[in-house]
Amino acid sequence: MPLRRLLCLPVLAALLGPLAAQAPEPPNPVTARYTKREVYIPMRDGVRLFTSIYLPKDSSRPHPILLQRTPYGVGPYGEDAYRRGVGPSPAFADQDYIVAYQDVRGRFMSEGTFVDARPARTPGDPKAADEATDTYDTIDWLVKHLPDNNGKVGMWGISYPGHYVAQGMLCGHPALKAVSPQAPMIDLWEGDDSYHRGAFQLAANFGFFLFFHSRHDAPSPDRPDVTEVGTPDGYRWYLEAGPVAGLEAKVKQASEGIWEEYIRHTTYDAYWQARDLRPRLRDVKPAVLTVGGWFDAEDLFGALACARTLTEKSPATDSHLVMGPWTHGQWASGDGSRIGTAEFGSKTAAWFEQDVELPFFNHFLKDVPGPALPKATVFETGSNRWRTFDAWPPKQAKPLSFYLESQGRISFTRPGATDGFDAFVSDPARPVPYTQDISFDYSAPYMVEDQRFAARR
């Protein structure tokens, strides 16, 4: 290339740079299709919950309602401030659902007091409230006050919002026809988020409370700043921080007292038992699509426990399970074709959104005919294929035991008393890292990382 052309390139880039920076943002498709309303919906005990509602401009026919309840804020706030997408996925963009987002009690713009994984209310008190009654009261208000709705409601949510779906599907409102608890918290001690069979999830919990701050004294749309730790090196930071008790001061104000509750209740006591949803998952009326990911380090337990419990305790429920090769919520962020260096041969998340999730809601909320969903749709890693089953766990499944042997081997045969063994030293001053990434965040792809760097220590 001639020298004069090379010299022109920086000049051209300098001229075009400001123009590119000033380029207008693409039109928001939601503003063209929806009108936004913000309302306070009264609950039976007088508390009002802030709800942001997107109403289709098409009034030629009635539309079903999709509801998400969340502790993370329903922003952007203001009736002239619109999301850039509504509903569970982009596949819903042209489906004209009425979509409602609600701040749960004590979070952001809603009134009341926030309680983590709120236990069930006291029976017999008509004014007592819990997440199921709040869901009932919200649905009742929506179907009675929103124009052009067809009287059918669905719910969806991932992680904590998925927990609110699992609680909400117990509300018994006749308009609630279909729900999708996705990576739901079902039992925070047994295997979701807080503890894994009694093992406190330090990095996950501490990182969560760095951003899950207490709000102001009154309802507010403001999102508090994330608490800064001053370093990207989480391994070094936790090593120097010392015992868990020493971390309390760093998150005490931010966590609304939840951190103290977590570390005070280290056994499966009444605190955790009251938050276990499994005993309550009975006689569930709406159709259920439970979704989870095999590589979900936070709530893998919840999805499987939800599906299994519905099978055992609510057999009449039209219940379906989808388990894909995903990290926490990955089916709703990206195409699901890979995690780190692990590739799955197809766009698994895009397929789920278009061919499973959308048809599920369209069938139960719009009466659209669709293929019958199998009881379980499960991705088999290694062979990289979807498999379907008429029961979960599959009827043909058999338990298989693995045994650790010496020299880093694994076997299907129980070792004898005289077989060799390997010994390891557990040194709290030199803990084994789970990832090579220099990061303070909980690394989602660590399950597929090459762990030989740690095994060589």
Predicted regions and their residues:
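C-terminal, loop-rich substrate-recognition/catalytic regions characterized by aromatic stacking residues
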Residues: 229-245, 322, 331, 336-457
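N-terminal cap/lid segment of alpha/beta-hydrolase-fold proteins
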Residues: 24-61
